[in-house]
Amino acid sequence: MSKYDQFIKDVGPQKFSRGGMLWMGFLILLIVAGVVAYIDQLIEGQVVTNMRDYVLWGVYISNFVFFVATSFVGAIVVAVLRLTKSEWRRPFVRLAEIVALACIIMAGITIVIDMARPDRMLNLFIHARLQSPITWDVIIIPTFIVVSLLLLYFPLLPDLAILRDHYSGTNKRLSKIYGFFAAKWQWTQKQLKLQKKSVHLLALMIIPLGLILESIDAYLFSTTYRVGWDSSNFAPYFISGAMVAGIGALVSVVYIVRRNKQLEAYITEYHFDKMGKLFNL
């Protein structure tokens, strides 16, 4: 087997093993249980969550803060490593991009779940108050999702084209799917130049967007009269806290994927050492 075929076998799409199928079944059961609980909340009201004055948002806001922090750090790490052209980033940077996108999508879903009347979500735009951090939260999260998606997709184009060509003779259906998402990528100089400029621009954009995202979330807390929350230092506090929690979550995800997919040849101890130094920094 050539190195190319071995590489495709290692990192290309694979069928679920028995353990993978059991894990997917478990996750589907969790989703079904969550949907049932959410329907109960819609019918009975948020009283079923047992949230009161002293437990204002409960698990919802905890999940929201965690997902935003992890997404922020994943995006910042990707952007900084791409802008500095650090070569050691290559084996795991795609994982960081996926984590960043998945977490910010989950943060948006958490907001919808937390709303007592999601059918009135349009009122957030119709009757928006620009002095409210909630309004800016509604604006910044979709923006961050779009930029994160593009920052994942544009560098992915050559990989999709490789899989398109690889399966062209063995699996026409997969080849067509990858060909559709590869968007006629042919490695021309024009395409490579445009891709490089686009990724560079997106990396520059996502850093201030991430800082704004974390700052706005901090203002959701600091603009209240609750003792200990009414403080102007919440934004830097949230950003520093996000760096700790987010990098920790990112390292955990990389380790789990590395071990589960047997990618020790690609993600080595050297990369964890680098991520540890980044964590300390």
List the model feature ranges, each with a label.
Residues 105-108, 134-138:
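Juxtamembrane membrane-interface segments at transmembrane alpha-helix termini
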